[in-house]
Amino acid sequence: MPGVVFDLDGTLVHSAPDIHAAVNKALAEEGGAPFTLAEITGFIGNGVPVLIQRVLAARGEAPDAHRQAELQGRFMAHYEADPATLTSVYPGAEAAIRHLRAEGWRIGLCTNKPVGASRQILSLFGLLELFDAIIGGDSLPQRKPDPAPLRATAAALNEEVVLYVGDSEVDAATAEAAGLRFALFTEGYRHAPVHELPHHGLFSHHDELPDLLRRLLA
């Protein structure tokens, strides 16, 4: 059987609430005003450095490498200390992956979240064992939408990877750049209408995913 690679945030787990909490904890330490969940959700997708850049820009702060590193470090300390209290696995996601594994699929994860935090979250939800390869936002010099992380994940699976499953503009662009078909989860963190994202199939509930993959392989 071929391989399939998944994104994490907004695709397999609804993690925005914990990311939101960690950002606001870091800002509260310096007396900063909190962001709303919707605001932080809108900043997710390009990795932690870009998340923090967007937070600082939204506060009206000029780009500053020292400031970026300082806030990013405090954010990660809070996030890694409590990454999953408010996070949930999307309904049907675990069952879908277990179903695919039972059919012989090799399963990979390609995310812009740091690999340590990604493994921690997967472990807390009992999902870590389901993945044959994991590439995070700090595994390579490049991050999505550069195709290098997705290609590295595919290579690590030692199978022909035929599909990337994600939820956002970043994921769609990554799959396109890597030359892979893309399955779009419509209930994640995308900003644009579905029709504006290049995709080969879409689904709104993970129960639909195994049948969708079979159709895309036909």
UniProtKB/Swiss-Prot annotation:
This is Phosphoglycolate phosphatase. The gene is cbbZ. Specifically catalyzes the dephosphorylation of 2-phosphoglycolate. Is involved in the dissimilation of the intracellular 2-phosphoglycolate formed during the DNA repair of 3'-phosphoglycolate ends, a major class of DNA lesions induced by oxidative stress. The keyword rRNA-binding does not apply. InterPro entries: HAD-like_hydrolase_sf, HAD-like_sf, HAD-SF_hydro_IA, HAD_sf, PGP-like_dom2, PGPase_prok. Belongs to the HAD-like hydrolase superfamily. CbbY/CbbZ/Gph/YieH family. One of its GO terms (cellular component) is cytosol. It is an enzyme of class 3 (hydrolase). It catalyses: 2-phosphoglycolate + H2O = glycolate + phosphate. Mg(2+) binds at residues 7, 9, 167. Its EC number is 3.1.3.18. Pathway: Organic acid metabolism; glycolate biosynthesis; glycolate from 2-phosphoglycolate: step 1/1. Its cofactor is Mg(2+). The active site is at 7 (nucleophile). The keyword GTP-binding does not apply. Keywords: Calvin cycle, Carbohydrate metabolism, Hydrolase, Magnesium, Metal-binding, Photosynthesis. One of its GO terms (biological process) is reductive pentose-phosphate cycle. It comes from Cereibacter sphaeroides (strain ATCC 17029 / ATH 2.4.9). One of its GO terms (molecular function) is metal ion binding. The lineage of its organism: Bacteria, Pseudomonadati, Pseudomonadota, Alphaproteobacteria, Rhodobacterales.
